[in-house]
């Protein structure tokens, strides 16, 4: 089968590999029908993910059709259309039982697909712990509508959930890339008083204005003053940092009012510093919002009800044999790209 594979630092390659087979009674084999490219794939390409193993097929955002299941799998059957969770998790350890599946302690737990084991930018993928990692797609939900459920949409949903958003709040979201927009959609479900999105890219600002005209937008340079002028208590009640730069990390806590919640959703290429003398007295609560894929069934229900729609984010579609073009487009943010779908 065709796969897109991490060969060495800076190099992915389209190559043939054997079709995966069941290796455990809890596995499933999924025929991939649609996949996407994530910034995390780019981190692997450039050597920023030490756990990533050269020779691994990349890709962790995908949907498909179950082809085969192990003897212990009960939640899905061959022929089911499914989303695939970016995380594999056992469902039995302390963290899984308490809903923190991102911290699963099994050796295959956490982010394995497309990082430590072969992922889904391929014709087929083996999914460990299939009962936890696969969710059936409702009949009237399309593959494109469900494509982002297992990663960036689950990330945004978890981040919004842990941020304690109330209807009287002013919420600031820093960053309007794919994860930032998914976070925005999930924050909108909480119906806060106002939402401000901070973004520098004019194309992404236009996207926000076109699709979500009720949302306020501001550039990073004007953000602090704008938030103070458009909030009730001298700053945002909740800040979600989804951009992942040193400057945006600082901007997040600077724009927060005293006693606010600051949720860090982004990944950073290097460690960040909390300048505690500058922050003293703000009494901020910091949370981290890394993807926790325990809510995928609820997210699919919201999509089926018409309350969540990420299809507009899929701005470009390529076949697998042109995936290198798709990566070039996505990495260089060309032609107004938000998300790219890879189809078979």
Predicted regions: what is each one?
Residues 1, 226, 250-254, 293-344:
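C-terminal hydrophobic helical "lid"/dimerization subdomain
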Residues 34, 85, 240-242, 344:
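Short, well-ordered coil/turn residues at beta-beta hairpins
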Residues 163, 188, 205-285:
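Glycine-rich cofactor phosphate-binding loops and adjacent beta1-alpha1 units
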Residues 199, 266, 290:
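Conserved acidic E/D residue at the C-terminus of a beta-strand in Rossmann-like folds
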